[in-house]
């Protein structure tokens, strides 16, 4: 999106910085009929223009404290967000130590991981081995998205 900086130009408005991961099949038994979006509540103010219209309250109060859910259809949101899936989303946010945004659409799951720094940026004043360890740690966290989130979908009841 862009915001007018002056009458002649616009500057980009940054809504998110981090990694985006797309899983082509969240759960081979389920298809999301429309979008279901799950946002960390801490970052919700930045995403007002990018969400679908219907806010959803789940029956999990801890999940509701940490996440905002929006969907095109309430029934579909409850179909996708089983108690186990909500627990795994919470576990993934804890592993990320940052803001997490998820969107379910048809068979796909889009996961964005907001991190304070670019895990692949090279710093001159930090030893190479320390940077290598940080990159290995960051990529392990990104791989955990599949282990945590896809596992949740595959083992959730119909």
Where do the protein language model's features map onto the residues?
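Charged, low-complexity intrinsically disordered regions
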Residues: 1-158
């Amino acid at each position: 999106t862009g915001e007018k900086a002056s009458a002649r130009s616009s500057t980009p408005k940054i809504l998110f910085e981090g990694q985006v991961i797309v899983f082509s099949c969240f759960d081979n038994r389920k298809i999301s009929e429309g979008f279901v979006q799950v946002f960390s509540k801490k970052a919700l103010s930045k995403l007002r223009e990018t969400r679908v219209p219907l806010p959803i309250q789940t029956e999990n109060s801890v999940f509701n404290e940490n996440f905002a859910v929006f969907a095109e259809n309430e029934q579909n949101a409850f179909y996708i967000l089983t108690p186990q899936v909500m627990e795994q989303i919470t576990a993934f946010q804890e592993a990320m130590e940052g803001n997490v945004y998820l969107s379910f659409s048809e068979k796909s799951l889009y996961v964005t991981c907001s991190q304070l720094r670019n895990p692949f940026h090279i710093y001159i004043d930090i030893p190479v081995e320390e940077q290598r360890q940080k990159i290995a740690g960051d990529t392990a966290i990104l791989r955990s998205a599949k282990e945590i989130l896809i596992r949740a979908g595959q083992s959730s009841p119909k």
